[in-house]
Structure formats: C-alpha cells, structure tokens
C-alpha cells in the first residue's frame, strides 16, 4: 500500500515566502479542477473560486489582510460561499428556495464546500512542489473585499490562499499537532476534565519546546497561551452583520 499521500500531508506547513514565479494557466486550471473534484453536499456546489493575478487587486487585498504574501506569491485564490447561481435558479422556481440557501444550514453547507475544495487544491499544489498559505485575514474587512472583488448578493468571501514556489530561504516546518488521543474519540466524546487538562498540559510543553528550538529561545509560549491571546481578542465581531448583508443567515 502506497503511503505517498499520507507522507505528503504529514509534511504540510504554511509557506509565507515565495519565489517571484507566476503559476502558469495550465497549473491554475489543474488546481481548480482538482478542487472541483471534492465532495459537495447534495451536489449543491455552493462555492466559487476567484483567481487573482492582477497586482492592483492583490495590493488592495493586502491592505485588508496586512500580509505581504497576499501580493508576493505565484498566484492568489479567494474562496467564496456562492448561492448567486442558486438565486438565479430560484427566480424561475415554483418554490421559495431562499428559505434554504438563506438559512444557517445554507451557510454551513457553503462554508464546508469551500473548505473541501480549498484543501483539495492545497494538497494538489503541494504534490506539484508548490507551497501554500491560507488567508483568513481577508475577513478583516469583508465589506471591502466584497467591493474589491465585485461580489454580488448571496456571495461571501471565506478565505484566501496564496500559492507559489517556496523561496530558497523559506524554512518553515510542520508544527506538532494536538495528540492523537486528544482529538480522536472512540465511539463517543470523552469529556473527562482531568484527562483533557493532562493532555493539554503535555501538548503545551511540546509546543513551548518547539518554539524555543525554532527561535533559539526567543519564543516559548504554550498552545494554551496562544489560544487565550487569540480568542481573548474580540476581532471581527461584525461577521453576522456582514453575512446578512450578503443575503445569508436570513433565518
């Protein structure tokens, strides 16, 4: 049994520094086709992919993201929940379909579809020798992103992905993930607090040692400290409002 795919995904890490080499149209097409082969709930295909090589558009999106690799990459993808085409079908339907695609369930379906497509693209790109980094930072200003990309109603930007050849001095590495026994629950969820705390304490030590080694002692924070800092920062609190402005979560 080949373990090629297993070994490939186990090596995954975010690449944030790329060579100045644009992806060819053929490569972009293959990546998108690989993405389209992902599973999709009820065959709704409630997503679209926006490919961006226009430097001005990239720069505008960089201002939203704050990350240089939004511009400095081989190619930029933006993944959106897309019910615009379903809305067009709805205009000639005998039933009110908006009750479904404008619901919270509709949001979940579209977001999951987009994520599955993106992961297919990520794995395919890495198999081709490219590096990738996901860009949730495009949600820093959803209204601006919708304006930049001319997104119609019922279309919502979920995240981006920068793709390209890793720079020669790119030295990223896979971060240790949560322990297998902490994320895999056999038959039912195991919520025993003592076990959970013990597993997280071990993981905190692993992450602290990882950062200490990677940064020559400049970073030593634990995973729990990172989570406290991130989740304690009340960011993007307008998301429900922005979703509703897009025509989603109406009920």
Report the location of each language-model feature:
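Acidic, surface-exposed loops and disordered segments
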Residues: 1-251
